[in-house]
From Swiss-Prot:
Bilayer disposition of the protein: Single-pass type II membrane protein
Protein name as annotated: Adipocyte plasma membrane-associated protein
UniProt record similarity statement: Belongs to the strictosidine synthase family.
Side Cytoplasmic, residues: 1-39
Parts of the chain that traverse the membrane: 40-60
InterPro entries registered for this protein in UniProt: 6-blade_b-propeller_TolB-like, Strictosidine_synth_cons-reg
PANTHER family linked to this entry: ADIPOCYTE PLASMA MEMBRANE-ASSOCIATED PROTEIN, STRICTOSIDINE SYNTHASE-RELATED
GO terms under cellular component: membrane
Length: 412
């Protein structure tokens, strides 16, 4: 045995070196423990959020009780409906001087409209002048609307006066020059045993004798228009008021959100927009078909608001929400799913839901037989937003809105 061999035999055992491999089991164990903690925390958080949500879905009442509605596939946005930006060529008028000019009428070149703060105003020489108010203030929030009033449909009569329907107050005649207001029919007056909760639009015969108007619902008020649309309540009516006899007749009942109305040029029928059914109904008021009704046009490319005469002998129809095709229409999707609509309005306010509705404004011109003639678009609602009416006068379209702080004018 050599000395070296002896030294090798007597060499003490080397201390074990701690390496990464040696730590691996401990690290894996720590990782496993951390993973369990993360999963447990995640599950607790999910339960913390889910249980109240489920409780809300079970315990909270939905403000609506919708029925399933079925629509045809929307018309393709091709040809006459090909998207364009023509509405973006419009100019804004009276910006930040008024809000929500829903409907427009003219006497000569003087324009009139109703606003969200309950006023009827005259628009002349760049100035906004209040000529009537049917309610009383304050007029700042949706809760104020019933007391404040909300003028909607407005028409010029034959004697230099205006006929105005207020969603909450009733049917009025206004002398804009003398600022005189006459109540023709109070919304508090029950018609055939039912109240009028949401007066909307009107059209007047040339002699001023008959006024045809819509009551969108006997259940919902204007401030809850989105709930009415989502529920699709069939309690809307088309009515007739005789300015001489003061008699009121129900012409059509069981309408789902009737909105705009327009007499034909010959005054033999009245067109009434049925917003929740994306169609326009026709009721005959004279001639061989008197008392009869049919569908004038159905399966519109959007949800129609007001309807007004065009210089071509047809009609302008305004739409603040479209049924995109190709594309996706949330309102069409929800129409056949009442449970989803109930859940949405259990959890979210109308104002929150409105934020998810694309601001696509569409104005459609119809022929006298209901065929599509042309369409004007603002795909992003950049200029014309929440469009409610297209009123033609002297080669221009005056474009109303139920929310915008201005009026728009487009040269045709």
């Amino acid at each position: 045995m050599t000395e070296a061999d002896g030294l090798r035999q007597r060499r003490p055992l080397r201390p074990q070196v701690v390496t990464d491999d040696n730590r691996t089991p401990e690290a894996k164990g720590g990782s496993s423990f951390s993973g369990r903690v993360f999963r447990a925390t995640f599950l607790m958080l999910a339960a913390f959020l889910t249980i109240p949500l489920l409780g809300a879905l079970v315990l909270l009442d939905s403000p609506i009780d919708p029925e399933p509605l079925s629509f045809k596939e929307p018309p393709l946005f091709l040809g006459v409906l090909q998207p364009n930006t023509k509405l973006q060529q419009a100019e804004r008028l009276f910006e930040n001087q008024l809000v929500g000019p829903e409907s427009i009428a003219n006497i000569g070149d003087v324009m009139f409209t109703g606003t969200a703060d309950g006023r009827v105003v005259k628009l002349e020489n760049g100035e906004v002048e209040t000529i009537a108010r049917f309610g009383s203030g304050p007029c700042k929030t949706r809760d104020d609307e019933p007391a404040c009033g909300r003028p909607l449909g407005i028409r010029a009569g034959p004697n230099g006066t205006l006929f105005v329907v207020d969603a909450y107050k009733g049917l009025f005649e206004v002398n804009p020059w003398k600022r005189e207001v006459k109540l023709l029919l109070s919304s508090e007056t029950p018609i055939e045993g039912r109240k009028m909760s949401f007066l909307n639009d009107l059209t007047v015969t040339r002699d001023g004798r008959k006024i045809y108007f819509t009551d969108s619902s006997s259940k919902w008020q204007r401030r809850d228009y989105l709930l009415l649309l989502m529920e699709g309540t069939d309690d809307g009516r088309l009515l007739e008021y005789d300015t001489q006899t003061k008699e009121v007749k129900v012409l059509l009942d069981h309408l789902r959100f009737p909105n705009g109305v327009q007499l034909s040029p010959a005054e033999d029928f009245v067109l009434v927009v049925e917003l929740a059914m994306v169609r326009i109904r026709r009721f005959y008021v004279s001639g061989l078909m008197k008392g009869g009704a049919d569908v004038f046009v159905e399966n519109l490319p959007g949800f129609p608001d007001n309807i007004r005469a065009s210089s071509s002998g047809g009609y302008w129809v305004s739409m603040a929400a479209i049924r995109a095709n190709p594309g996706f229409s949330m309102l069409d999707f929800l129409s056949e799913r009442p449970f989803l609509k109930k859940v949405i309005f259990k959890l979210f306010s109308q104002e929150t839901v409105m934020k998810f509705v694309p601001r696509y404004s569409l104005v459609l011109e119809l022929s006298d037989s209901g065929t599509f003639l042309r369409s004007l678009h603002d795909p992003e609602g950049q200029v014309v937003t929440y469009v409610s009416e297209a009123h033609e006068h002297s080669g221009h379209l005056y474009l109303g809105s139920f929310r915008a702080p201005y009026l728009c004018r487009l040269r045709l």
